[in-house]
């Protein structure tokens, strides 16, 4: 379904950028998902060890350390088992940019296109966190000097259909 991938990339490509820099780039990951998953889970596990070994780790972050340990242990026991990181999705789109706002705007437009194409996505903050701590992940995805990973979009066909959105707090609006 390369035509759908091209439409998603075009949604990002045609998004406005600061001073028309057009500094956003994309890495499409399909065949390398297992290797990227291994590297990411290994990095998260190492991060969890540091967090659990430090008395300075804020208590609200300890739940993530324990979660990352369980994810890694589950992966080591059965690499082909349940995937709690990328959820067996067939496609990752990693958005990179020099300017975070440019990359964020492109990611938002791409998410809308993904939805319009009948696909589902979520943004993997765990991947972004691991990539920020492991330069080998950046090398693997072709991160250039001056670029930052803005988002990792996990894309596939949704297994469930939601009848409503999640509850949200009211918008905080100032009118002048």
Where are these regions (language model features)?
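Acidic, surface-exposed loops and disordered segments
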Residues: 1-176
């Amino acid at each position: 379904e390369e035509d759908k991938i091209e439409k998603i990339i075009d949604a990002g490509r045609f998004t406005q950028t600061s001073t028309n820099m057009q500094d956003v780039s994309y890495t499409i990951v399909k065949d390398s998902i297992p290797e990227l998953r291994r590297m990411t889970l290994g990095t998260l596990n190492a991060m969890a060890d540091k967090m659990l070994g430090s008395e300075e780790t804020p208590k609200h972050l300890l739940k993530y350390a324990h979660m990352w340990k369980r994810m890694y242990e589950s992966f080591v026991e059965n690499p082909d088992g349940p995937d709690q990181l990328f959820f067996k999705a067939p496609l990752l789109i990693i958005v990179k940019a020099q300017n975070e706002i440019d990359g964020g705007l492109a990611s938002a437009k791409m998410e809308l296109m993904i939805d319009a194409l009948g696909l589902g996505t979520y943004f993997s903050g765990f991947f972004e966190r691991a990539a920020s701590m492991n330069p080998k992940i950046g090398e693997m995805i072709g991160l250039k000097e001056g670029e930052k990973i803005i988002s990792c979009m996990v894309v596939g066909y949704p297994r469930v259909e939601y009848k409503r959105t999640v509850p949200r707090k009211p918008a905080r609006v100032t009118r002048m």
